[in-house]
């Protein structure tokens, strides 16, 4: 007979600050936060499916589609009979977190060559860090186990594993960096009108590659067949993670502009001003041919 032991698990995914703040548009900010929430939610649902109980955050996980946002971490408890079972659950939690973005990554590598596919996969694999620590509850009070796990989590996060990027036998990435994160090489680029006319793209975009499209997905300035103009602008270059953020739930005119966000407090005041509202009504009426005197 194998006896069950109860374990407390703390799960966390990052990087948070760098991922969210690497942005040029309000959609980038929205997508960064939303993606981390969805990745954590997928891990939570898997954990519950394995018989786990979520302690924090407290949400109605029976209706996951109604959950708009959650933190990038959760605390749960689960009963397991062996250390191997616990380790398998932790490994699966890490894998489940990335499933949310696999489809977007696969969309990028569609119809690309092996060199570019490898480059995209390396950037994808090296970016997100999923951390899990677990401790047996036993006869110890919950707060004692939890506090010890928090200390372990801090230690684990500070002991980061280093992965060396290698492309075609060349150590490191040489070439133009992403407009969002400024760290990873560009994998998706939209040409400017001038580059379309001259049929030339700056050599800085590529890494000694002939033909150049082996290293970067290049779109013409007005080509919206594969990527819309609001997803990637002229002259803009995006890395794998930045491209996924830009594509994620991106619809035309869905997000407010940064200018409108800065002026929202003034718009709220104007809505309370009857004179302004009457003026707006007259202007809108004149557009419809019903101008009032």
Language-model regions, residue ranges each:
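Regulatory and interdomain segments flanking nucleotide-handling catalytic cores
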Residues: 1-293
């Amino acid at each position: 007979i194998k006896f069950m032991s109860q374990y407390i698990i703390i799960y966390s995914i990052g990087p948070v600050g760098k991922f969210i703040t690497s942005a040029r548009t309000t959609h980038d900010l929205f997508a960064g936060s939303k993606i981390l929430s969805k990745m954590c939610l997928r891990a939570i649902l898997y954990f519950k499916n394995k018989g786990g109980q979520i302690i924090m955050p407290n949400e109605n996980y029976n209706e996951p589609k109604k959950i708009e946002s959650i933190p990038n971490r959760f605390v749960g408890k689960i009963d397991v009979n062996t250390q191997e079972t616990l380790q398998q659950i932790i490994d699966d939690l890490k894998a489940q977190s990335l499933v949310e973005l696999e489809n977007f990554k696969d969309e990028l590598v569609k119809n690309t060559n092996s060199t570019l596919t490898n480059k995209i996969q390396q950037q994808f694999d090296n970016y997100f860090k999923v951390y899990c620590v677990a401790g047996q509850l036993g006869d110890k009070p919950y707060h004692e186990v939890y506090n010890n796990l928090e200390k372990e989590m801090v230690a684990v996060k500070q002991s980061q594993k280093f992965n060396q990027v290698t492309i075609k036998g060349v150590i490191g990435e040489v070439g133009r960096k992403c407009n969002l994160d400024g760290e990873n090489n560009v994998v998706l680029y939209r040409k400017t009108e001038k580059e379309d006319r001259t049929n030339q793209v700056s050599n800085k975009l590529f890494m000694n590659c002939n033909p150049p499209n082996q290293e970067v997905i290049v779109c013409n300035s007005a080509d919206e067949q594969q990527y819309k103009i609001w997803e990637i602008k002229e002259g803009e270059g995006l890395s794998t993670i930045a491209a996924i953020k830009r594509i994620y739930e991106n619809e035309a005119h869905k997000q407010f502009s940064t200018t409108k966000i800065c002026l929202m407090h003034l718009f709220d005041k104007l809505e309370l001003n009857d004179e302004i509202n009457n003026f707006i009504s007259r202007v809108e009426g004149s557009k419809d041919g019903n101008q009032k005197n």
